[in-house]
């Protein structure tokens, strides 16, 4: 799916008029075009399904990989900074940090690809909970591992700048699949690494 930049420009112009402003005035005359270009960038992830994102970042390594059933064999990455926009108010979700872990099953994904997946999934109209589920699903597709965990901490503009206006309120979500959900030793190790 391609983003319809021209339609966005027209709708932003209409919003400016609905707000009681003049979209032809000096400070606003290029605003519809700028917003459309920004939306094309910040919502880039909406152009791709989870399957397509998995295909895009499917760079794995299998040779010389010694992975055992030992619970110590875990790939863990944290403090991946992303942003997103909530689908309810189009408000920014910011100061988001993602931690991702998986237990390899014969192949590993390139580390930069993990961060790229998180970034691309965030570039959609989202719920924080769905970001975690989407990342876990894509990582499972690429690595064939059922054992995936995603922890996300973030602030939501819809909570901090409107409504209840609780600045500093953070939301933490967890998506736990496979052993991260069923094996206490594995989940304890995950939490130890996350809080380290």
From Swiss-Prot:
Q: Which residues bind Zn(2+)?
A: 86, 89, 158
Keyword tags: GTP-binding, Hydrolase, Metal-binding, Nucleotide-binding, One-carbon metabolism, Zinc
* Recorded metabolic or biological pathway in which this protein acts: Cofactor biosynthesis; 7,8-dihydroneopterin triphosphate biosynthesis; 7,8-dihydroneopterin triphosphate from GTP: step 1/1
Which PROSITE patterns does this UniProt record tie to the protein? GTP_CYCLOHYDROL_1_1 (PS00859)
Task: Please give the biological process terms from Gene Ontology that the record holds.
Answer: one-carbon metabolic process; tetrahydrobiopterin biosynthetic process; tetrahydrofolate biosynthetic process
According to its UniProt record, the EC number is: 3.5.4.16
Question: Which GO molecular function annotations are given, in alphabetical order?
Answer: GTP binding; GTP cyclohydrolase I activity; zinc ion binding
GO annotation, cellular component aspect: cytoplasm
Report which reactions are catalysed by this protein: GTP + H2O = 7,8-dihydroneopterin 3'-triphosphate + formate + H(+)
InterPro entries (UniProt xref): GTP-CH-I_C/QueF, GTP-CH-I_N, GTP_CycHdrlase_I, GTP_CycHdrlase_I_CS, GTP_CycHdrlase_I_dom
- Gene3D superfamilies noted in UniProt: 1.10.286.10, 3.30.1130.10
Question: Record's superkingdom?
Answer: Bacteria
Q: Which Pfam families match?
A: GTP_cyclohydroI (PF01227)
What quaternary arrangement does the UniProt entry report? Homomer.
User: Which protein family is named in the record?
Assistant: Belongs to the GTP cyclohydrolase I family.
Q: Which HAMAP family match?
A: FolE (MF_00223)
What protein is this chain from?
Answer: GTP cyclohydrolase 1
Q: Which organism is it from?
A: Clostridium botulinum (strain 657 / Type Ba4)
What gene name does this entry carry? folE
């Amino acid at each position: 799916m391609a983003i319809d930049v021209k339609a966005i420009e027209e709708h932003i112009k209409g919003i400016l008029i609905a707000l009681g402003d003049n979209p032809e005035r000096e400070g606003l005359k290029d605003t519809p075009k700028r917003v459309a270009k920004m939306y094309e960038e910040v919502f880039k992830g909406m152009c791709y399904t989870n399957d397509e994102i998995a295909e895009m970042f499917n760079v794995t390594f299998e040779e010389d990989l010694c992975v055992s059933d030992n619970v110590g064999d875990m790939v863990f990455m944290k403090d991946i900074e992303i942003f997103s926009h909530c689908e309810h108010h189009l408000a920014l979700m910011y100061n988001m940090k993602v931690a991702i872990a998986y237990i390899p099953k014969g192949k590993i994904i390139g580390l930069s690809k993990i961060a790229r997946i998180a970034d691309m999934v965030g570039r959609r109209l989202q719920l924080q909970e769905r970001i975690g589920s989407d990342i876990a699903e894509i990582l499972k597709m690429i690595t064939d591992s059922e054992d995936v965990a995603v922890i996300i901490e973030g602030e939501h503009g819809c909570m901090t700048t409107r409504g209840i206006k609780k600045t500093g309120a953070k939301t933490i979500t967890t998506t736990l699949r496979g052993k991260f959900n069923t094996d206490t030793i594995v989940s304890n190790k995950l939490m130890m690494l996350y809080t380290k």
